[in-house]
């Protein structure tokens, strides 16, 4: 009787597998001819006006504007605040031959995934369904080899000499407008206790020289004797302490690891009477909790101070937020909808791909491995203008690209929140 039941169960399983394979095959045939392709020229032709972060509106564009700006989009100076880019020259290809630089960050079945990708010409996509993929292997860079993607085709290249000579000022000030900063983050776990408390190093990639050098910007490490996540950021990689001369910021979380605040090096308002010495809040990051246990991409909201526009006598500066009471903090102001002089950003929602059964984002060749840590930051009024993007390229290497209005400290602090485990978000 037991053998009969086993045979019946096995036959049932085989029949279900066959039905699932036929269904997937039919779905592939239906959608193979209409897979979205990423055409750089077409994307650039649709660009008109681009967002600015002045003190009045979130972005100075009309509601009907067509906006499409990627992290690899050139910005050409005109009379507009952010101008229409020049088209890149690309080899002529048929639409189905242009590969999408998509990174998968959601759930999927592992079986026959390579076959699924090849059916729709997405063989360079990588997929994942776990929080910690450190031990897994992934595909190579998904960027189409016919496109030159290792140079920043933006309007203005970073002033590398200024950055080297004025490191502390550069990391704290808002980024220069029309300039993209391509950075990398290295996670170092070596040492007795660095498996639990790794050190993170942020470097700016230098592209206007033949040597492709990297400029050290910041280092970060989680404090050992803290009950919640508490990361110290410093421009001195040899002294990651509050007493060090390079100490410039810290990132603090709540108990669940779902809400984070990025502070500058100022003092706690409870420990000083000097208002000018009180710490500023540079950003707050809120991860949406997942109380029902549904797995999927993380949802982030970033609250940050607004930017005072530049004048003849000074560049653009950040509006100071120095809360003395809890109700004046960025997190509380966001909860109470008190958003005057604040900017609200969020992560770009990935798109579900039926063929790979996963969520995907286009990182334009800067991210090569799947992870729920990967994200792109946008303003909802201009979802194609990527303010920041972060993602994995190897077990302990990540890329972090950012633009105005973020500073290096703000961007690095936001990246630190992605490294920290979130009990209620998985």
From Swiss-Prot:
Its main location: cytoplasm. GO terms for cellular component: axon; cilium; cytoplasm; dendrite; non-motile cilium; periciliary membrane compartment. Signal peptide: none annotated. InterPro entries: Tubby-like_C (IPR025659), Tubby_C (IPR000007), Tubby_C_CS (IPR018066). It is found in: Cytoplasm; Cell projection, Axon; Cell projection, Dendrite; Cell projection, Cilium. Changing residue 252 to A: Abolishes localization to the periciliary membrane compartment in AWB sensory neurons. Disruption phenotype: Twofold increase in fat content. Extension in life span. Defective in chemotaxis. Reduces AWA cilia complexity and branching from the AWA periciliary membrane compartments (PCMC). AWB cilia are severely truncated due to elongation failure during postembryonic stages and AWC membraneous ciliary fans are significantly decreased. Increase in localization of PtdIns(4,5)P2 and PPK-1 to the cilia base in AWB neurons. Reduces lengths of ASH and ASI neuronal cilia. Mislocalization of GPCR proteins to the (PCMC) in AWB sensory neurons, such as srbc-64, tax-4 and arl-13. Residues 19-39 are annotated as: Disordered. It holds the Pfam family Tub. It comes from the Eukaryota. Keywords: Cell projection, Chemotaxis, Cytoplasm, Lipid metabolism, Sensory transduction. Residues 16-28 are annotated as: Required for localization to cilia in AWB sensory neurons. Expressed in ciliated sensory neurons. GO terms for biological process: chemotaxis; lipid metabolic process; positive regulation of neurogenesis; protein localization to cilium; protein localization to non-motile cilium; receptor localization to non-motile cilium. Has a role in fat regulation independent of daf-16. Implicated in ciliar sensory function which is required for normal sensory behavior such as chemotaxis. Required for extension and growth of sensory neuronal cilia during postembryonic development, potentially via mediating signaling protein transport and localization of PI(4,5)P2 to the ciliary base. Functions in life span control via the insulin/IGF-1 pathway. Thought to be involved in neuronal trafficking. PANTHER family: PROTEIN KING TUBBY (PTHR16517:SF7), TUBBY-RELATED (PTHR16517). Interacts with rgb-3. Belongs to the TUB family. This is Tubby protein homolog 1. It comes from Caenorhabditis elegans. The gene is tub-1.
